[in-house]
Amino acid sequence: GPAACLHTHPPYATSISCEQDLIVLKPIDEEGKKNLGNIVIVEPDEDNQDEYLRQLAEALKQGNMKAVVVKGHGVFSTGSNFDEAWRWASVIEHSMRVLMHARQANLRV
């Protein structure tokens, strides 16, 4: 299994994850599409920590994901070491920044 798990609070991924009824994030940039595909969004459940952790683990297992986003909170990313986990967190944030800028420019995405 992974040797590193990183938790970050990136502003773009966190902001976009707050969209109502959104269950996955879909990168529009080529790096995000190629390396990430769809990114699962997990609903936070502070009242039931065991269920919350189970959902995080299950989301990471889906499609062999390298990272998941907790709605309105942040990113959990995994890797064989810290650098790899950091790379996945960085790719997600870059992709969500591109998406946010495209939306602000009213580009069709």
Model segments located where?
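Glycine-rich flexible loops
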Residues: 1-109
